[in-house]
Amino acid sequence: MIQVQTRLRVGDNSGAKELMCIKVLGGSMRRYASIGDIIVASVKEATPGGVVKKGDVVKAVVVRTKKEIKRKDGTYIRFSENAAVVIKDDRSPRGTRIFGPVARELRDRDFMKIISLAPEVI
């Protein structure tokens, strides 16, 4: 569960290291984001020479959350950190590599490029 002011690690090589959520997209009073949801975030920490700089406002998709989510078969999945991938307006990732595992739920939300770049889909 990601809400406004939540800090997330970045799971790609776009140049950002840490994001802070400033808006959850999808509804006027929407409060929480889960895996597969799009957020608007501010870059709080970045690597020098990256595509995005500190202070940039970017869109990102949540790929890992510490809060567990329930699947249709009754199992639960959770990760050890909150992480997101910076995306463009056409929902494709801004980086060329994805780090760490991503959840299978991204496939249902049509983030196939992120699924194909990820080293592990859980």
Curated annotation (Swiss-Prot):
Gene3D superfamilies: Ribosomal protein L14
Gene Ontology MF annotations: large ribosomal subunit rRNA binding; structural constituent of ribosome
Keywords recorded for this protein, A-Z: Ribonucleoprotein, Ribosomal protein, RNA-binding, rRNA-binding
CDD domains: Ribosomal_uL14 (cd00337)
GO cellular component: cytosolic large ribosomal subunit
InterPro entries tied to this protein: Ribosomal_uL14, Ribosomal_uL14_bac-type, Ribosomal_uL14_CS, Ribosomal_uL14_sf
Protein origin, superkingdom: Bacteria
GO biological process, one term: translation
Record bears the keyword RNA-binding: yes
A Pfam cross-reference name: Ribosomal_L14
Disulfide bonds: none
Quaternary structure annotation from Swiss-Prot or TrEMBL: Part of the 50S ribosomal subunit. Forms a cluster with proteins L3 and L19. In the 70S ribosome, L14 and L19 interact and together make contacts with the 16S rRNA in bridges B5 and B8.
Function: Binds to 23S rRNA. Forms part of two intersubunit bridges in the 70S ribosome.
Similarity comment text for this entry: Belongs to the universal ribosomal protein uL14 family.
Record's protein name: Large ribosomal subunit protein uL14
Species assigned in the record: Desulfitobacterium hafniense (strain DSM 10664 / DCB-2)
Taxonomic lineage: Bacteria, Bacillati, Bacillota, Clostridia, Eubacteriales
